Amino acid sequence: MSDELTKEQTALLRNAFNAFDPEKNGYINTAMVGTILSMLGHQLDDATLADIIAEVDEDGSGQIEFEEFTTLAARFLVEEDAEAMMAELKEAFRLYDKEGNGYITTGVLREILRELDDKLTNDDLDMMIEEIDSDGSGTVDFDEFMEVMTGGDD
């Protein structure tokens, strides 16, 4: 899970971790985890926090090493990124769905895809649109749009 973090996120977590490990022991007490998460904007109730700590503190030492800490924090950071991406895609879809009827035409989708990757040939675009608009309706709803933009379930 922690390999999904960017270098910037890892550096941010390292700084937060080090701030709570002033003796440089290489671990923080589990009691500090809630404090750090709330500083990162995540308020958790005691039961949820205890569950998360129990899951991450695999050796039950009451101490969280940096690796355990990044695994724990990655859940929140990656989740946040996914939510932010979803909101951005919703907004992008709304911009192209000018009539507000919940779908865009395949012509509009073609423009979007071309803007995202100008190396796509007309054949590439035709194949992609054929796959996306499997019912041949000439329209793409938000769910289909999301599948295209996020790579679907495969």
Swiss-Prot record:
It comes from the Eukaryota. Ca(2+) 1 binds at D57, D59, S61, Q63, E68. One of its GO terms (molecular function) is calcium ion binding. SMART domains: EFh. PROSITE patterns: EF_HAND_1, EF_HAND_2. Gene3D superfamilies: EF-hand. Keywords: Calcium, Metal-binding, Muscle protein, Repeat. Pfam families: EF-hand_7 (PF13499). Present only in adult muscles. Ca(2+) 2 binds at D133, D135, S137, T139, E144. SUPFAM superfamilies: EF-hand (SSF47473). GO terms for cellular component: centrosome; cytoplasm. InterPro entries: CALM/Myosin/TropC-like (IPR050230), EF-hand-dom_pair (IPR011992), EF_Hand_1_Ca_BS (IPR018247), EF_hand_dom (IPR002048). Residues 8-43, 44-79, 84-119, 120-154 form the EF-hand domain. Belongs to the troponin C family. This is Troponin C, isoform 1. It comes from Drosophila melanogaster.
